[in-house]
Design a protein with these regions (language model features):
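Short Lys/Arg-rich basic patches
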Residues: 2-43, 77-119, 164-181
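Short, basic amphipathic alpha-helical segments that act as recognition/interaction helices
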Residues: 44-78, 117, 121-162, 174-180
Length: 181
């Protein structure tokens, strides 16, 4: 008797896909429009790196005051392929807790991770800031783009950590509200 393999249904495939590829509890969805905007920014910017994970690491590095503060991030690291995982430089790991998440090479997925990482960093450093859930993804991404634009190719390695954090928080005031409001 020959045993035939049953084809997985679309629902089963989606569930399996969700379980193995993104942590749904810590990833925010972003619109295609915002993903395209961020892609355009990364492509046209003067940053030496075009790897969005490097940009997130750079933001976290400054937010953590060059590693002196601990920032807990639920999602930060992309694994380009299972065989060759992304290995951030040692300095970006200081004061951070990383959870590796295996994702595909889709711009939208990278944007989701960037939003989640930035959101968690802001929450960790500024507990009095609460997100407007209905607009968080797009605004977090706008915030990230604005923040990245402050780090030019010439000064990104010597950028003041305190200035970076102050700049990020001042930008966040436009997009986030505090619990006291």
């Amino acid at each position: 008797m020959v045993k035939t393999l049953r084809k997985r249904t679309t629902k089963e495939q989606k569930r399996r896909h969700d379980q193995t590829y993104l942590s749904k509890t810590s990833v925010f969805r972003v619109s295609r429009k915002m993903a395209d905007l961020a892609t355009q920014f990364i492509t046209e910017s003067g940053l030496r790196t075009k790897n969005i994970v490097d940009i997130v690491h750079l933001m976290v590095w400054h937010l953590s005051d060059n590693g002196k503060k601990t920032i807990s991030l639920n999602v930060l690291t992309l694994l380009p392929t299972p065989q060759e995982p992304f290995k951030p430089s040692e300095k970006t790991l200081i004061g951070t807790e990383l959870k590796r998440v295996n994702v595909r090479h889709h711009v939208k997925d990278a944007m989701d991770l960037m939003c989640a990482a930035l959101c968690n960093a802001i929450r960790s450093l500024h507990p009095n800031v609460s997100l407007r859930a209905y607009e968080a993804p797009d605004y977090i991404l706008k915030l990230a783009i604005n923040y990245c634009s402050q780090l030019s190719q010439e000064d990104k390695d010597v950028y003041s950590a305190q200035k970076a954090e102050d700049r990020l928080f001042s930008l966040s005031v436009r997009y986030f509200k505090t619990d006291s409001e």
